[in-house]
C-alpha cells in the first residue's frame, strides 16, 4: 500500500482525496497533515511515496515543504502532486524544473482529474517510483505506458512524461510544448483509429 501525504486545509481537496482513496483503499493510504511542521516530520520519517502539496491553503507553507524535499536526496522517492489556485502559478512552479514534481494542477483541474491520476499512477508504478534511478547510476532509462481508451488519460500521460523530460533537462521549454503537442496528436489519432477501425491507408485515401 502506498502512502499519500496530503498537506492541505482546503475542504474541497480533502473531500476529493477521501472520496477517491476510499475507492482505492487497497492501494493508497492518505495521511492528512493540516500543519507545515507536521507534514515535514511525516515526510522525514515515513517517506511517503506520494506527496500532495496544496498551494491554495494559506495555513500551509507549501513552498517550505517543496524546498525541504528538493534539498534532501533521501526524500526524492515517489513524487509530488502540486495543487495551485491559478494557471499562472502552474507555470511558475513548472519553471522551477523540480524533478520531484509529477504534475501541477489548478484546484479546478485537480477536482476533475484526481481519481484519474490515482488510477494512472497505480497502473504505472515502475515509471513513477523508479524514474531517475538509472540516470543516477549511469544507466539508461526506459519504460512503457498502458493507456486506455479515454482521451483525457492521454492528456495526463503526456503531461507526466513531458514534464519529467523537461525537469530532468532532457528537453527545453520550447521543446516541451512541441513534444506535448506532437504526442497528444499522435496518441489521439491512434485512439481514434483503434476505436473506429480506420486504417492509416483508408484515412489517407479519404483526405
Annotate each PLM feature.
Residues 1-4:
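Extreme N-terminal starter segment of soluble prokaryotic enzymes
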Residues 8:
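Conserved acidic carboxylate
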Residues 11-33:
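Two-component/phosphorelay signaling modules centered on CheY-like receiver
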Residues 27-45:
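A short, well-structured beta->alpha microelement
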Residues 34, 83-127:
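Output/docking surface of receiver
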Residues 36-39, 49-71, 76-77, 84-92:
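Conserved phosphotransfer microenvironments
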Residues 116-181, 192, 196-206:
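Bergerat-fold GHKL ATPase/HATPase_c domain
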Residues 185, 189:
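Conserved polar catalytic motif of the HATPase_c/GHKL fold
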